[in-house]
Each structure stands twice: as C-alpha cells, then as structure tokens.
Amino acid sequence: MADSGPAGGAALAAPAPGPGSGGAGPRVYFQSPPGAAGEGPGGADDEGPVRRQGKVTVKYDRKELRKRLNLEEWILEQLTRLYDCQEEEIPELEIDVDELLDMESDDTRAARVKELLVDCYKPTEAFISGLLDKIRGMQKLSTPQKK
C-alpha cells in the first residue's frame, strides 16, 4: 500500500466547516515527522506538530464526482425526511450506488433499496423512483479512469 503522506507523515483530516460557513468541506493536512525538513534550522519546534496543507488528487472525472456528491447529499436529505430525524439519527444503512449500478435492471435495484429501507415507516416509493432516475446514466467510481 502507498505511503499515507510525504516523508512518512500521517494524514490528518480537519473537521468540515459548519453549514453556511462557505467552506469547501474537510481539508487534508500532513503531519511532518520530528526532524523533517520545513521545521526550521534548529530541528523540532516546541510548538507541536507542523501542519501543512497537502493536495489530494484522483483520476476520476470531476463532473462525475460532482454528480455523485450531489446524489449523496440528495440521498441524505431524503433519508432525513423518510425517517423524520436529523442526519446523525438516521439508522445505519448504506445505499451503495456502485452496487446499484452493477445490477441488471431497475426492478432489482428497487428491490435492493426497498430491502435496505425495511425499517422505514413512511412510504418509500417516491424516494426509490427518484433515486433510480438520478443514478440512470451514472458511471461507477470503484475503479479510476485510465488516461
């Protein structure tokens, strides 16, 4: 497996900014190991670990990632309505879009989602129909695209 950061540093995820703060989401920082370059001429500073922002790159199409992110946000919004609760209180369930895309037909996809929502007391047909409409034409993100 590849190193988690430059010079053997550990990757740290900063918490996501709160809603309405205008932030772009969580940021990834790399913590430099003691004595690493960039800590000053005297070696380790007394101020604790040095945090520098790292860039994360992937080989996925940016447009496809944006569609996936929008879909995941829509799913969370719909689940909070279906379960009539806050996002943190939604029962543990995972709607795997790639798994749904692997299935042969909309009927099998609908059956799988209905199976996942078995504990929901509200009608789920509109959610399932909307989900199937939104994933139609999407690409799987399990494997990076070759360039």
Swiss-Prot record:
Pfam families: PP1_inhibitor (PF05361). Residues 1-15 have a biased composition (Low complexity). It comes from the Eukaryota. The modification N-acetylalanine is found at A2. InterPro entries: CPI-17 (IPR008025), CPI-17_sf (IPR036658). It is found in: Cytoplasm. One of its GO terms (molecular function) is protein serine/threonine phosphatase inhibitor activity. One of its GO terms (biological process) is innate immune response. Keywords: Acetylation, Coiled coil, Cytoplasm, Phosphoprotein, Protein phosphatase inhibitor. The modification Phosphothreonine is found at T57. Residues 1-55 are annotated as: Disordered. GO terms for cellular component: cytoplasm. The modification Phosphoserine is found at S21, S32. Phosphorylated primarily on Thr-57 by PKC (in vitro). An unknown Ser is also phosphorylated by PKC (in vitro). The modification Phosphotyrosine is found at Y29. Its main location: cytoplasm. Residues 61-103 form a coiled coil. The keyword Protein biosynthesis does not apply. Belongs to the PP1 inhibitor family. Inhibitor of PPP1CA. Has over 50-fold higher inhibitory activity when phosphorylated. This is Protein phosphatase 1 regulatory subunit 14B. It comes from Sus scrofa.
